[in-house]
From Swiss-Prot:
Its EC number is 4.6.1.17. It catalyses: (8S)-3',8-cyclo-7,8-dihydroguanosine 5'-triphosphate = cyclic pyranopterin phosphate + diphosphate. Substrate binds at L75, C76, H77, M113, E114. It comes from Enterobacter sp. (strain 638). It comes from the Bacteria. SUPFAM superfamilies: Molybdenum cofactor biosynthesis protein C, MoaC. Homohexamer; trimer of dimers. One of its GO terms (molecular function) is cyclic pyranopterin monophosphate synthase activity. This is Cyclic pyranopterin monophosphate synthase.
């Protein structure tokens, strides 16, 4: 089994030293879902929500969150992201919104946390914008879909819906 990288020999939390690592292209994708009543989703789709464009606001929030991950998650490195993408898709069949984020950089550490943070904060933003019309929306699951680059190799989540 792998070791926890953020715990030192004394069992204390610490920031991982990446100074000796090679710079490689690293990319991660994550997804999150927000499930809601069909009426709430319809307001988002037809643009009748009184707070404005829910998807545009959630997209911007997700992008901003990816850029601030180092400030939100202890022990994350500040990264020079070269690409952050947040896509939102209304899924009327399941009465939910699917959020997929992509983060990419050329650097010494991965971007999994940035991708997960982008998807999570976009989901939280949808909740925030729609809570006046529905408070029992459900956020989740949130998960890493893919990761590439770096010493630990590539990862691809099992597909399920």
């Amino acid at each position: 089994m792998s070791q926890l990288t953020h715990i030192n020999a004394a069992g204390e939390a610490h920031m991982v030293d990446v100074s000796a690592k090679a710079e490689t292209v690293r990319e991660a994708r994550a997804e999150a879902f927000v499930t809601m009543l069909p009426e709430t989703l319809a307001m988002i789709i037809d643009g009748s929500h009184h707070k404005g464009d829910v998807f545009a606001t959630a997209r911007i929030a997700g992008i901003q969150a990816a850029k601030r991950t180092w400030d939100l998650i202890p022990l994350c490195h500040p990264l020079m992201l070269s690409k952050v993408e947040v896509n939102l898709l209304a899924d009327p069949e399941h009465s939910r919104v699917r959020i997929e984020s992509l983060c990419r950089l050329t650097g010494k550490t991965g971007v999994e946390m940035e991708a997960l943070t982008a998807a999570s904060v976009a989901a939280l933003t949808i909740y925030d914008m729609c809570k006046a019309v529905q408070k029992d929306m459900v956020i989740g699951p949130v998960r890493l879909l893919t990761k590439s680059g770096g010493k630990s190799g590539d990862f691809k989540a099992d597909s399920h819906d």
